[in-house]
Amino acid sequence: MLFQQVYVFLQKMNNRDHENHKIIAVDLDDSNLPIPSHEILQERKVAIFDLLSENFFKPIFPKNYPNSIGPYRLDISIKDQLLVFKISNVENHLIREILLSISPIRKILKDYNEICLSYYNAVKRLTPSQIETIDMGRKAIHDEGGRILINRFNRKVDMDFQTSRRLFTLITAIYLESSK
């Protein structure tokens, strides 16, 4: 009985901890980008919905850093070949800004875009087994993009693999627009 009570307590604590370490809002700053197509806007909405529905995102702060308790709001933009991640608390007070160079992920962003285009074209004209082969390649590149993001955020943000994959999707969307 005591074991069960301890287990329930730990589950509640874990759930509360998880609620504090998640993204609850995302804004993609596209003010300096071309107007996105209807398809791009739809992809963004789906990617944001997926990210917000389930994520683990825990910025790493020094101890007793003010206003650092989540959940978090995340603004993503590209400025001067840098990915800019502005992390705010629920009250929308900026608590951390992370700048990452696009250079280390530029190739995988382009590769992912190319294979996505191949996949969309394949759906219209290829057999299911051919489509499945392309989709497996797309998923592998997407996974690699997620792993690269986890490494790039090392010592800045702890996140799970699914969160990194979903962020990679959003970064791809705004990066491709910025490179047009």
Feature locations, PLM:
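C-terminal charged interaction modules
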Residues: 123-180
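Short, flexible coil/linker segments at or flanking structured domains
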Residues: 14-16, 64, 71-73, 93, ...
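Charge-rich, low-complexity N-terminal segments
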Residues: 3-71
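Generic detection of intrinsically disordered/low-complexity segments and helix-coil linkers/edges
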Residues: 1-4, 106
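A surface-exposed, charged beta-strand/loop segment in the N-terminal or early-internal portion
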Residues: 63-117
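Long, charge-dense
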Residues: 17, 24-35, 105-128, 132-139, ...
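Generic alpha-helical propensity signal that fires on short helical segments
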Residues: 41-46, 118, 167, 175-177
